């Protein structure tokens, strides 16, 4: 679990997704479909670092995405998810847009819990048989309080919703490095298993709705 972060984090009972999301749109969307609308890039009275212009391709072997989820009582789980591919565009020194495909079938457990991994892949959670990929598409970038503020569409299980999170992004020669962290409310993406919002009398088997993700990205300029 490694370098430029746009994480994505997911969990047991998985499951926790802290409401950074808005406008849930339970609409089927082609995985990783890019919109043709230009990304809104604004620099709010702060001078953003000047990035090196170019098209960057994510180095999936040098990048890492982690997830963390827990029950309401005493049970925390963490693991990795593989970024399948990704692209970032920098123009006039600013990040103009990016998109990433996430391999949901690659979900793993740091504890090596095969039963947990199997459950996360099942229909109760990510239903990877029918939805093997998720996507993150950046459509708005601002710079505030020493960090890039990223707004992106996150697609999981055919549902798409907007999330906003801070990120650190730098370029060095032909490399782009990024780190990010965000939380989501999994129920927005119709992942309801063990949620106290939808089921009563779960007691200590209740799984938190929030899932935390971290991303460390490294990308190569083409």
What kind of feature is each model-predicted range?
Residues 20-222:
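Low-complexity, acidic/polar, glycine-enriched regions of mature
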Residues 6-14:
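Hydrophobic helical h-region of N-terminal Sec-dependent signal peptides
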Residues 15-19:
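C-terminal motif of bacterial Sec signal peptides marking the signal peptidase cleavage site
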Residues 1-4:
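Positively charged n-region of N-terminal signal peptides that target proteins for export
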